[in-house]
């Protein structure tokens, strides 16, 4: 049924990582890897769009053979261009930071036993105490809350190991966070981003950048400058429509799913995420994302044969 929704034109496909292309154990199925390779071979732009920081996201991209192209990290606060010739294999092309002092103060008051952390652009995390083993892939350095609040950051994180996620959500809702974006995950984990910064805002800016690049290169017929036009795609300078598909499973994916021409929620997603999508695919443990991408590939094959 999903195939009926899929566009025929050239695509930008934004994919969440955890719970979408990776399962809860951090594993990627062979089918998922094969689907991504086939999709890229059909000319689609695949953009990893994740809450992970750079150092945690790059290995995922490399695992599926993405060593060039674009990636959205830190829930939209960082956009990077992967380039094998650049130092570290990437170049940060856009980043948004904010003063974390108010968020740190509010969160540490609301959940005194929680772990507070801030993400430093390209430099891992400063943490109030170490995270549980395996939860934070990037480097972490224990510092005081005062030091955390001393410079702009791309993200503030609050983690409360052992706390029920519903209790955690209530405490966060009542703590007085203002002028920021925030999303709560499957566990008692909170990401706080600069105001107005989401995966969707970063993808919108990226689509505009790609369109401008195409215009400068003289490829007007393939211009991909995106301006939000509802749920029918994103229209470039020349009137050409760039179709966009996004797949995700978390609260931090809701804006991205609404932004995309087709937003697909994983079957394992919370109901609020499903309600924000156009279609719902199978859960991650049944390769729901791969099934959707396979349908896209099959649709483009039929188009090319017609």
Each language-model region and where it sits:
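Short acidic-hydrophobic, aromatic-tinged amphipathic segments that line or gate anion-handling sites
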Residues: 94-96, 141-143, 280-284
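Mg2+-dependent phosphoryl-transfer enzymes with acidic/Ser/Thr/Gly-rich catalytic loops
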Residues: 3-4, 8, 12, 29, ...
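Short, structured coil segments at secondary-structure junctions
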Residues: 64-67, 75, 176-178, 259-260, ...
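Active-site phosphate-binding/coordination module
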Residues: 30-133
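Hydrophobic packing residues within well-ordered alpha-helices of enzyme cores
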Residues: 32, 57-61, 168, 172, ...
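Conserved acidic, metal-coordinating active-site core of Asp-based
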Residues: 110-221, 233-247, 251-253
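Short active-site oxyanion
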Residues: 43-47, 67-69, 155, 242-243, ...
């Amino acid at each position: 049924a999903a195939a009926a929704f899929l566009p025929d034109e050239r695509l930008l496909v934004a994919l969440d990582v955890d719970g979408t292309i990776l399962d809860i154990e951090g594993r990627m199925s062979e089918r998922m890897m094969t689907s991504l390779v086939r999709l890229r071979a059909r000319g689609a732009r695949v953009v990893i769009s994740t809450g992970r920081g750079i150092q945690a996201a790059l290995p995922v991209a490399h695992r599926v053979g993405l060593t060039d192209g674009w990636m959205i990290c830190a829930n939209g606060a960082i956009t990077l261009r992967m380039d094998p010739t650049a130092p570290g294999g990437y170049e940060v092309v856009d980043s948004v930071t904010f003063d974390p002092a108010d968020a740190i103060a509010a969160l540490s008051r609301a959940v005194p036993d929680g772990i507070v952390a801030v993400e430093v652009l390209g430099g891992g995390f400063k943490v109030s105490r170490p995270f549980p083993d395996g939860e934070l892939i990037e480097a972490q350095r224990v510092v005081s809350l005062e030091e955390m609040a001393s410079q702009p950051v791309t993200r503030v994180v609050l983690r409360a190991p052992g706390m029920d996620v519903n209790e955690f959500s209530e405490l966060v809702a009542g703590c007085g966070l203002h002028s920021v974006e925030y999303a709560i995950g499957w566990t008692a984990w909170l990401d706080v981003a600069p105001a107005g910064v989401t995966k969707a805002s970063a993808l919108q800016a990226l689509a505009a950048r790609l369109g401008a690049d195409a215009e400068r290169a003289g490829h007007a017929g393939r211009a991909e400058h995106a301006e939000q036009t509802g749920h029918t795609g994103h229209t470039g300078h020349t009137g050409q429509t760039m179709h966009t598909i996004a797949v995700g499973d978390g609260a931090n994916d809701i804006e991205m799913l609404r932004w995309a021409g087709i937003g697909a929620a994983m079957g394992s997603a919370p109901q609020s995420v499903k309600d924000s999508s156009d279609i719902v695919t199978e859960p991650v443990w049944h390769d729901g994302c791969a099934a959707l991408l396979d349908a896209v590939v099959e649709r483009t094959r039929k188009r090319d044969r017609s």
